[in-house]
Amino acid sequence: MTARAIEDLLRELTPQVLGALVRRHGQFEGCEDAVQEAVLAATVQWPAEGVPNNPRGWLVTVASRRLIDQMRSDHARRERESATATEVVPEDVPDTDDTLVLLLLCCHPTLTAASQTALTLRAVGGLTTAEIARAFLVPEATMAARISRAKQRIKAAGSSFSLPDGAEREERLRVVLHVLYLIFNEGYTASSGSELHRADLAHEAIRLARMVHTQLPEDGEVTGLLALMLLTHARREARTTAAGDLVPLDEQDRTQWDRGLIDEGTELVKTSLAGPALGPYQLQAAIAATHADAATAEETNWPQVHALYLILERIAPNPMVTLNRAIALAETEGPSAGLALLSTLDRDERMAGHHRLLSVRAHLLEKTGDTAGAYEHYRRAAKSTASIAEQRYLESRAGRVRA
């Protein structure tokens, strides 16, 4: 097995091993340290000696021994943990994948969205603290403190390492999906910095979504989220020029879209829509599939897109949904209709000064022939975003309408 294949295998197994240890020993931070030591040992031994027949069992055994050694050397907790420390590490490790339970734990409701995201990437994604810090453009020390506080909050909450029942499980799963959605969005369109994409985050979100889908293939929203990610990610190569400038959807070279991802995503959409209920991720995936089905921008089925946004707006009201519906409405009934719908967002404090609202209004004003209004709103939008790639694009649009 090549070094890259071993690296990929370890990345896949790490959350499973961590889940197994947390279930057995119940201490998140100590288990994570022990798993990292076991992974480090594997990166040294496996290339030289070969991958063991049961690599997951090997990692669980080594990590358990490291954790027990750590417990035995901790004199302050010797009495409390003596029973655990004298346990014999089992030769046969149960073949149970606790990744989903670990994900639910990382997305504990007592944590903020930022902490849930960071802890998920660290514990389940296997990214280092430095990698996560770079992805979100914060100092490594800040990210390390955020992750540490998240672990302490989970410990203080006394959460058990088990799947919640009934309604609580559904609610926690929705939080997991939201966190994966946030990770993907930050990777697909970075909210700040010089790059439009952060491919590592987008790829990691898709990998984790696949993992959840493998364990919950019948869940329509899990399927819908994975489909949405695949259909959106399929456009990545066409979204920027060679110089890194943003290319809007209607101007993209669709021959650059990844047809394999589109085909997979479209099949997942069909599967998810056949279920008994519709959720927001399924509807967003259906919208993405409608765009992917059009060979050119002009062939887009805008009435269908608008109808889907209407349903989405009813079941999951959100100003960004209304914003996107305004674009679809402008394509079906004209820019004035879109502008009228946009005006309903002016009273929403969440959208005050938002660059997306300003840029869409600029685009629709440009379509009506109001170049002065379009120029003003493009400039305001450029000043309102922290993304340098988006700033460049919006400034170029402003220059174009003024020329």
Predicted regions and their residues:
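Amphipathic, Lys/Arg- and hydrophobic-enriched alpha-helical face
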Residues: 9-29, 41-45, 104, 189-192, ...
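Amphipathic helix-loop-helix modules that constitute alpha-helical solenoid scaffolds
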Residues: 78-131, 138-310
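Structural recognition of an alpha-helix C-terminal capping motif at a helix-to-coil junction
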Residues: 33-40, 53-65, 145
